[in-house]
Amino acid sequence: MTRMISTGVGSLAVRVRGQGPTAVLWHSLFVDERSWGRVEDELATERRVVSVTGPGHGASDDPGRRYTLAECAAAAGTILDELGVDEPVDWIGNAWGGHIGIVFATDAAPRCRTLVTLGTPVRALNRTERARTVFLLAAHRMLGPVGFIRSGVTNVLLSAATRKRDPEAVALVGDCLVRAGRAALRNAVVSISLHRPDLTDRLPGLSVPTLFVTGSDHKGWTPEQARAASRLVPQGSCAVVDGAAYLVPLEAPAETTDLVRRFWSASVPEYP
């Protein structure tokens, strides 16, 4: 079931599946909720899965102004209130969704039971990443999601191995870029990517069991960086998925669901 829920960052599309304790899924920038398609069925066998489509993506609105990770985290709280969820949730976030999860788990700690971040760099963009993003935004403004822009984004989000063996994943990323409203997508990238703060200082304040997952081919969030981040979290741990980059749940769904289940089993006494 998918419904639109009004939040401080616009009306957001929210899909609910399954029964049991609530797990919240929030996707990466540039793709929409379909990027969870390969893991959602499995997770919904033991959780009530609430999949949020972020502003400027899919069917969700754009608020018409810049917005922050904290506002996205507050929007998640609004969604949970609207759905009548009052127990702590298991948060799973891919890139952007992981950033929001870190903020949610520190700003609204009683509402979060566990946190899984997938391909989520904790630091702000470096100069090279910022310059590349500014160029892509300028080109997108002039030309829209033309071939070289789709290729540029795909080459960052998906590993070389995924691009070679998985044309469906490549097509999904491209389709998400084509379907997204142009101005709304750019607003999301500026708000969340270019304006993203360094979240390192929040890590020691994470009081919930936290798993940092990254792909072996993720240039912006290396295994070494993910391990270092996990050591700053009181109940932090780290895992690396071979042959993946940013979009771990799309690139390696079986490994993703296995990691999440094992993490929940170790972290939640009453699992599943």
Regions found by a protein language model. Name each.
Residues G10-R65:
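Conserved HGGG/HGGXW glycine-rich cap/lid loop of the alpha/beta-hydrolase fold
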Residues D41, V50-I92, D258:
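Active-site loop/oxyanion-hole signature of alpha/beta-hydrolase fold enzymes
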Residues T106-D107, C112-L143:
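Flexible "cap/lid" loop of the alpha/beta hydrolase fold
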Residues N126-R130, V146-P204:
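Conserved alpha/beta-hydrolase catalytic His-Asp/Glu region
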Residues L206, F212-T214:
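Short beta-strand/loop motif that positions the catalytic acidic residue
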Residues K219-Q225:
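Conserved alpha/beta-hydrolase "acid-adjacent" motif
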Residues Q235-P272:
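Catalytic active-site module of serine/aspartate enzymes centered on a nucleophile-bearing elbow/loop
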